[in-house]
Amino acid sequence: AKLGALPLGTGNKSERLLGYYTWHADDSPPINPLGDLFKTQVWDLARHLGVPDVIIDKPASADLIRDVHDEDELGISYHRADPILHWLLQGYTVDELKSSGLSQSDVDCVWRRLSATHWKRELPTVAMLSSTAIGEFYLRPVDY
């Protein structure tokens, strides 16, 4: 506020889809320029922009516990998860992805995480106690 600026988010599409973020913390910045990029695309962008390899190649981690990395906790690498997420978002089914040659265990891992963390990508339900409750059906008053 002192600088008249807004904080930027650093979350990416892979983390959001896999549910690997803190709910209502790193998923709720006012601006998130990387939010529609998969993790592997963020790495590609960083290389394109000249970010040093020592930063890009550092294993992704929430840095909450020493020597614990994202991919260890997820059970799959972003390099394997991102193509699966991409094709699921394009409308392919789990069975189609499995029959396409992708690892069945990888597809199952991604699908389980995607399904189990869907609730994290929804707005909270508001108890509608009045006709002016601010929830999913809220309409902004018209400015005259």
Residue ranges of predicted features:
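ATP/NTP-dependent adenylation/nucleotidyl-transfer catalytic domains that generate, transfer
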Residues: 1-144
